[in-house]
Design a protein with these regions (language model features):
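Class I SAM-dependent methyltransferase SAM/SAH-binding core
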Residues: 4-40
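A short glycine-rich, Lys/Arg-flanked "PGG" loop and its adjoining helix->strand segment in the class I
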Residues: 64-76
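Conserved catalytic loop of SAM-dependent methyltransferase domains
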Residues: 129-147
């Protein structure tokens, strides 16, 4: 049986156990690097079974472009799993991200969207099929299938 290719997209410092890693940064421990535009260096198109994005969506400058790129690399029927802050807690999340990245980490390169963006609608317009949605506390979990 062929092993599934699962990638933690935006994994940064703390990747999901058992997943390959991919980020826009050039950390040496990453398996793949996203060029921030249309390519994931070192990855074949239509080869990914699952992209996992945890606390990443609010750091993506151009949602449509990035999701279009991920779709290009997903197999037909491949999954996109997103865990991110929900709309009701977004301002708190932005405050904490700014505190962490700008003051503690002194990192001005990481994008932080100042307002909540409807990434779900972007995915649906790109042809992803929503399989699951749950909002709890400050987070929401969504799962999509690539058509």
């Amino acid at each position: 049986m062929m092993k599934k290719l699962c990638i933690d997209f935006g994994s940064g410092y703390n990747p999901k156990t058992g997943y390959k890693t991919c980020d826009v940064t050039s950390f040496p421990q990453l398996d793949f690097q996203y060029d921030g535009k249309d390519e994931i260096v070192g990855l074949r198109e239509k080869s990914v079974d699952v992209f996992y994005l945890r606390n990443v969506v609010h750091h993506i400058p151009d949602l449509q472009r990035t999701f279009t790129t991920l779709k290009k690399y997903l197999k037909l029927g491949g999954k996109l799993v997103i865990i991110d802050c929900n709309k009701n807690h977004y301002k708190t999340n932005v405050f904490l991200d700014n505190l962490w990245y700008r003051f503690v980490g002194n990192n001005n390169e990481i994008f932080i969207s100042k307002q909540y963006r409807d990434y779900i609608n972007v995915l649906l317009k790109l042809g992803f099929k929503q399989l699951y949605y749950k909002s709890f506390k400050e987070k929401e979990i969504t799962k999509y299938e690539c058509n």
